[in-house]
Amino acid sequence: PTQVYGGKCYQMEFLGDVNYPPDTVVKPGETFTKQWRVRNTGTCTWTTDFDVIFVWGDKIGGNGDITKDVKPGEEAILSVPIVAPQTAGTYMGYWMVTDNQGARFGYGTNGDYSLAIKIQVAK
């Protein structure tokens, strides 16, 4: 059964990392697409004018698009382009979804948890 947290229009459940789980080691300058699997647990459909936007942390990636409508209860893969820094180290970045009015939402009871990536750039 789909978990609904209080009948909010826009909210999601985080189902997992599709690729590049936390602490994945990447090469300096490597480019890739980070993907997360989520479920729309809200009461409203996400449309193609929604975006996946960078909100804080290390700015190692760009924004992504919602590429098809996601109805309540449906799963979706959210993607953003990443470019690993040239300098070795640990980098973390955080993204949320924005609706067509620019309002942000994430996952969790209050919708305030961000989708995250944590990479280790090799020396």
Question: What does each of the following model-derived ranges do?
Answer:
Residues P1-K123:
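Intrinsically disordered, low-complexity Ser/Thr/Pro-rich tracts
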